[in-house]
Amino acid sequence: MLDYRSSAKDALILLCDASSPMHVKQEACSESGEEESVSMTPFEMAVKVAHATLRNKVFHAPNDLVGVILFGTTEAVGVSDFKHISQLLPLDTAEAQHILRLEEFLDDARKFKEEFGGSSGDFSLHEAIWQCQSMFANIKGKTGQNKIMLLTCVDDPHASAAPKKRHAMAKATDLNNTGIYLDVVPIGKGFKMDKFYKDLVQLADDEHPLDETPGAERIEDLLRVTRKRIHKKRSIGRVR
């Protein structure tokens, strides 16, 4: 089926987990099979993905929109309706100042705590998704594909909070009804999609097979995975 929106600008929100586990360096398996320390924390890897994405958009898709939302921050910065959710970058075309802002967080790990107050586990994922929906709704003009790419190393964020889990699943169904795609990219080894995110993604998109690529342990692997998924176009088969 033809995708009549393929020539329009796309909109992408990188929804990055900023909770405490994201700021702890993990270990990865070396080529010899031995474990070795990874130089970047999962959060730094997520910011690096955002940085690489913006640089790519500048040269190859300057009309596309990219934003970065954090969930699991102590403060709510740039977001007025929800607690523990912050806007790192607005949903806008890629600009040099946005790239430089991301570099500040990559160059100085203290920048995160200074600006967002540190991490908090008392967030609601459905509110983070809701914030993304609101940003898409405020876009002026038509867009092609609207996508949320969620990056996290935590495979069951609401393990002890059943109501929050139910709310997240309901919000995922809402994404399905509004044509917003949700893609979850795991970071680190041992990530089990079937604990939580498998159901979430399938509720958000019941027409395409779930990508169950194992969690990326190194930044080069994560960049390769995210680059492929960002560029992947979905055929338009649903009537909205």
Predicted ranges, named:
Residues 5-98, 147-151, 182-189:
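Von Willebrand factor
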Residues 9, 25, 48, 57, ...:
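Context-gated lysine
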